[in-house]
Amino acid sequence: MSSTIFSEKKSENHNILWTFFAHNDIIVPVPFLKQRKLLRKRHLWGSFIGVYDNKEEKEMKVTKRDGRIVDYDRNKIVIAIQKANAEVDRYEQLADDKIESIVAGIENKHADNLLVEDIQDMIEQKLMSEHKYELAKKYIIYRYTRQMVRQANTTDDSIMSLIQNSNKDVMEENSNKNAYIASTQRDLIAGEVSKDLTKRVLLPEKIVKAHEEGILHFHDMDYFLQSIFNCCLINIGDMLENGTVMNGKLIESPKSFQVACTVMTQIISAVASSQYGGQSVDIRHLGKYLRKSRKKYEKHYNKKYGEKISKEIRDEFVKDRLHDELRSGVQTIQYQINTLMTTNGQSPFVTLFLNLDKNDPYIEENAMIIEEILNQRIEGIKNEKGVYVTPAFPKLIYVLDEHNCLKGGKYDYLTRLAVKCSAKRMYPDYISAKKMRENYEGNVFSCMGCRSFLTPWKDENGNYQFEGRFNQGVVSINLPQIALTAKGDEEKFWPLLEERLSLCFDALMCRHHALEGTLSNVSPIHWQYGAIARLKKGEKIDKLLHNGYSTISLGYIGVYETTKIMTGVSHTDPKGTNFALRLMQRLRLACDTWKLETGIGFGLYGTPAESLCYRFAEIDKKKFGEIKDVTDKGYYTNSYHVDVREKIDAFSKFKFEEQFQKISSGGAISYVEIPNMRHNL
């Protein structure tokens, strides 16, 4: 059989292009609509005789469910109807010319772009108009079967690979979780289910697509299924003073330091089980209970011995007993935090804030507590082999102020001890009270976990409040990808940045809306019993999501790489610094603008990107190839940090990064790697 096109003629009365074929020496005219790109020839004598392609015709496009725009392919429509056709009796089947007519009717819409759903709706209507009800039913079943396949659970492989210990991406995503332990695996399995539902059901397709393409990173999808938040500053002072409730049991205010330490660790564990980020505790609130213990021992020895022994001896007894309780209480904190397992499959991610406030009536007791915490951290905790090692938690933050900055202050001895501790155990981290007061309206307070900072907020009485506040969640933007897409052209870079920021805003609002309407019953320890608030049972948490009470964070990755692409130099070079600062200021302006427009506490946040810096770089390397100093390294530099390959001394690095910390007030941390300093203190 042979078929040859030998002439074409346009009809004057119809917008149809007639194509004449020589089919086995018989001239066959076949009409085709002008708007077709790729047209299968009319069905003749039970066989198709070729394909017609008029390249001058306007291309027809189809918009898929995920927003992608693809070329129109009529074959897919024909195949779908034919599959339904094969499912019904012969008398219910639709003839091939009728199928062709349906397809032609769709193509005759003269639309440059059709939605997939619209095409399917038209097919169903056509089948019904032909009175092919059984066929229409089969097509509808076919349509929705395909939809179910698209929306089918996609977690089987990831869950089975977790159980088989072969899913390295998930197992290594969080270094604080031992993915081989059954209880941790249960959390990771739940996380895979949450990620699957988040992508298929909860998030708009454009956000999921942006996440998959590395345009942005929607953090903590594995917990997005539930109405829980990121990180917080526990209002531990209120909980210890006014009591709390755990597992339906009333916990009254402690009468001693040891009990206060035990209750605090129980609170930390309960809080960690109902949120996914870090938490911080200001140990200043423990000083009061150490004094209670002192008074208890003084009363005991006065009653027991009276004037039988001198006051000096009684004071020695009190001192010894108090020191024993102090050591035991701090040891309780350290061991409980490192041995308790929360429902999210790890030890509580908690930070102890070691701050001596000169106006604190319990400053002497708190100095004793800080000293014991540092001494026990220097000692370490024994591992299973009996060797002292550095515990991962609690993370320690030590505040440097006028009275302990090694300039003759009363508490300089604590700073020397902290330095000794850092040299051996890497912690504590340090905060400058002076710099914090400059950047946070005169206030000194802890970050939430590792680096997320609240913005100043005043209650109805005009008093600043930080404890009992939280962060709603994080979305991070991939800055180097914008520069790579713009090919280093600033005229393209800045408009594209605006588009990506708009996408990040939408993603962040998804986080915010997911928390709106949440009832306090979801986590009583947070919302009803003091960690965050003392709401009524069944009360919505919405008022805590607005007016800047809580924060929501825009993270960012790769200021160094972005600057390198756009300027050709590092952001430590004056030319690069100028661009990097403009970029950071634009990110900050976006957050400030969103905050004004919505009343929600948007903040700019230097993302903790231990795994994300690799993910973004890997995605971009596949798309843009290996680019020197950008994708060839296999990672992007975290936030505004100096590239680790750059030769720069520790003090110069801190000085350089300081200017970015002021802009990134919603979260910032700077660090250096140093050799063994234990013999250089």
Q: What are these model-derived regions, one by one?
A:
Residues M148-V149, D156-G548, V569, D573-L681:
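Conserved catalytic cores of very large enzyme subunits
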